[in-house]
Regions:
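Long hydrophobic segments that form regular secondary structure
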Residues: 9-10, 14-42, 53-85, 214
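Single conserved hydrophobic/aromatic residue that forms the stacking wall/gate
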Residues: 1-8, 13, 366-373
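N-terminal beta-alpha lobe that positions the nucleotide/phosphoryl donor
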Residues: 45-49, 56, 74, 95-133, ...
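Major-groove recognition helix of helix-turn-helix-like DNA-binding domains
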Residues: 86-91, 141-147
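Regular secondary-structure segments
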Residues: 63, 67, 90, 94-97
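Amphipathic, well-packed alpha-helical segments that form the structural scaffold of globular domains
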Residues: 26, 30, 90-94, 222
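Short alpha-helical segment immediately N-terminal to, or the first helix within
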Residues: 2, 64-65, 115-116
């Protein structure tokens, strides 16, 4: 069986911490992972089999194995991955356990919180291990952020040297890291600056069309006399050519990182509407933090993306729509299908194109395990 799982690539910039870069890299894939640890619904029944067979999920099988007490030698025997890398991954699991000893964000000592950031833990991960909350965790995420800023634990901004450090180079090609301190560029409030959020890693149904939109946005901003600031991390895109904008942050498109950039740049506003699903998913979170979102209002984006709200709007306007229901169990699905018949379209809110979507022509498609299993 052959499955196409990836259509693009991503690139992370490493300073001195492998742990930081592997965690950032796993977040930047854009498949809903929060890092090496702290992910939802990643459990393997036959762990030895998963470790012995290279797949796109094996790195998470290694995380589970380390949490279950597998030794580095045993994992090496099954995976043949160099023990140096396995040792670094074990550092992440060990530090997760250390963070889990705290019950309040305020109880985390400054040195422990700083080391967590050096090891690539996001504010979201730290909140999950310390507070163990439910839901989308936006409030808890911001609690960690506030504590971190209170302690002066902020990411450094470094230039990427494109000539392999043969000589100093003053580029506008930037990334953020906790492995070192300080800024390689100067910051001041600029009312004539705009941040554009790119598309991140390409995936099936989300590709070069959003890069075209992003490039046009930054070019138009420059023509209008605005300083253009791009955040993106896909090396295949034109928008990550640092000649295209005034500043390029080659970094995560996460809520945490975008706020970090906004805190430093103090822009006139942020454009989320040209990068596809990842920026769209950030729109309401940024709006709730009083970040000026240019273009379509985040409230309108949410009204279009959220299927319940969109359906209610159609009803209010008297516009016909296909029969649909929000379902959480197979029994509910079967009951709905008995009413409307096949085929049925299955998809969540806040997705573009074919992501997380399926057309079912019989019950086997929605009751059987995925091809991965």
């Amino acid at each position: 069986e052959i499955r196409l799982s990836l259509v693009g690539s991503e690139m992370c910039i490493r300073d001195s911490s492998f742990e930081e870069i592997i965690q950032k890299g796993l977040r930047m894939i854009g498949q809903g992972m929060h890092g090496f640890v702290g992910n939802d619904s990643v459990e393997f029944e036959d762990l030895d089999h998963e470790l012995a067979h290279p797949t796109d999920l094996r790195v998470f099988a290694i995380a589970q194995a380390l949490e279950k007490g597998y030794t580095i030698d045993r994992i090496f025997e099954l995976t043949k991955i160099d023990p140096w890398f396995l040792g670094k991954l074990k550092n992440i699991v060990d530090y997760k356990n250390k963070l889990s000893q705290y019950n309040k964000v305020e109880d985390i000592p400054a040195d422990v919180l700083r080391e967590a950031k050096v090891l690539g833990f996001s504010d979201f991960q730290i909140a999950r291990f310390v507070l163990n909350p439910e839901g989308n965790m936006e409030k808890e995420n911001l609690m960690v952020r506030a504590r971190r800023k209170e302690l002066g634990i902020l990411p450094a901004v470094k230039r990427i040297n494109t000539v392999a450090s043969e000589h100093p180079e003053l580029t506008n090609y930037l990334y953020m890291t906790y492995a070192v301190q300080g800024y390689d560029v100067n910051y001041y409030k600029n009312e004539k600056s705009v941040v554009v959020l790119g598309s991140g890693a390409y995936r099936i149904g989300s590709s070069v069309e959003f890069d075209w939109c992003s490039v046009n946005a930054i070019q138009t901003a420059r023509k209008l006399g605005y300083k253009s600031i791009m955040i993106n991390y896909n090396p295949e895109t034109v928008s990550t050519d640092y000649d295209m904008c005034d500043r390029l942050y080659f970094d995560e498109l996460s809520f945490e990182r975008v706020l970090d950039v906004i805190d430093l740049e103090q822009p006139r506003g942020v454009i989320v509407s040209v990068g596809g699903q990842i920026p769209n998913n950030l729109a309401m979170k940024l709006y709730r933090q009083s970040v000026p979102v240019l273009g379509t209002s985040p409230v309108s984006i949410d009204r279009a993306e959220n299927r319940n709200k969109f359906s209610a709007m159609l009803d209010q306007l008297g516009i016909d729509q296909p029969a649909w229901q929000e379902l959480t169990s197979l029994e509910d699905v079967k009951g709905f299908v008995e009413k409307v018949g096949y085929p049925v379209l299955v998809r969540p809110s806040y997705v573009l194109s074919g992501a997380a979507m399926n057309v079912c022509y019989d019950c086997l498609l929605y009751t059987s395990p995925s091809p991965r299993d």
